[in-house]
Amino acid sequence: MNKHYKSIKLPARLGFLSYLGDVQGCGTIRVIQPFLLLNHYRSTKNVQIISQTLSHYIFEPEYYKNFTFCQFQRSATEHHFKLFLHFKSQVQPKFNVPIVYEIDDMLIGIPDYNYATQYYTKNEEWVKKCMGLSDGMITSTPQLKKVYAEYCNNISVIPNHLPKFIWGDIYPAHDYYDGEKIKILWSGSQNHFAHSQLTPGVHGGDFGNKLLNFITKTTDKYDWYFVGSMPNELMPVKDKICFLPWQNIFEYPMAVKAIEPDIAIAPLMDNPFNACKSNIKMLEFTAMGAAGIYSNVLPYYAAKIKTNTDEEMISEIERLADDVDARRKTFQRDYSSVRSQLWWEEANNVKNYINTYLGLFRQRLP
């Protein structure tokens, strides 16, 4: 934290309020889960913290008088913009509560294969206007900050973390490998590839044809697990793949840990949209105890295994599948890379969260 920032006066009462844009994705990971921990944060007896999340806007200005920040998460429509205008004109003249725009995704220039592209393309100007009215912004990555700097000049970064109180301890699969078929996992939403029902006439996505063919041909050799969604190209072998449908985000950690994957893969196309993503999959794969194989894109610069082509990813899958010691070394290297970032509850990550919000306005905890 910048030494020129001013410490808040004690005793202090900090209030965090968030209007959620979603309650199952980044709204949970970046707002609901850390807000649960904020209520338990105690660095000193002289600091009290309250936090609250809402889905429906409250128009009465008096409601906001006890809050230090009002966060709007993933606001993207004309309706949201009108709420910003109301807050600026009706609330801020009475109470000095800044608007902080929280965002974990690139909402501009979304690839055609991503079914969200239609929604955000038509609302792109409202996204920019909401950012322009914000008193500050929080992004999940430095690259995302760089992209949005055109629309807001007061942006800080809070990386993603996982809640250990939900994920629990790590039990690496290589520690109890039983010699059975190797389990390989992919998890994610349908945004990673085109769907004929959602994006008619559009093809492509994060899975290349050679990787898809490899998966198709190795369903007898490996146990493939897809969690959340699955490419249409794999439908001919769907009965040989274990597919787990979408999971509630609070149940997702238990579901993927129960699989006990030996290897987890994160193929991503190298494009500006994916360059803005966080390393959330690297955190999740580490928390699962799996050896991770990633595409060589910006979010995974710290990973031990990064691949540039389908052929390279296939080669690494085969190498790790045949060598438990290689899986162990891969996991240990990746765990070392993300250890300080991994859990909200460790490495002062909750305190850093608070200080990042205060730092937007040149303040900090004592």
Predicted regions and their residues:
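Active-site proximal beta-strand in glycosyltransferases
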Residues: 70, 91-110
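N-terminal pre-catalytic "stem/leader" segment of glycosyltransferase-like enzymes
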Residues: 1-78, 306
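Nucleotide-sugar-dependent
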Residues: 194-202, 250-287, 293-304
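Conserved catalytic-core segment of nucleotide-activated headgroup transferases in glycan assembly
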Residues: 17-36, 161-255, 259
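A charged, aromatic-enriched C-terminal amphipathic alpha-helix characteristic of glycosyltransferases
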Residues: 324-362
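Donor nucleotide-sugar binding/catalytic pocket of nucleotide-sugar-dependent glycosyltransferases
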Residues: 132-170
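Membrane-proximal helix-turn-helix segments that form the acceptor-binding/catalytic region
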Residues: 89-90, 118-137
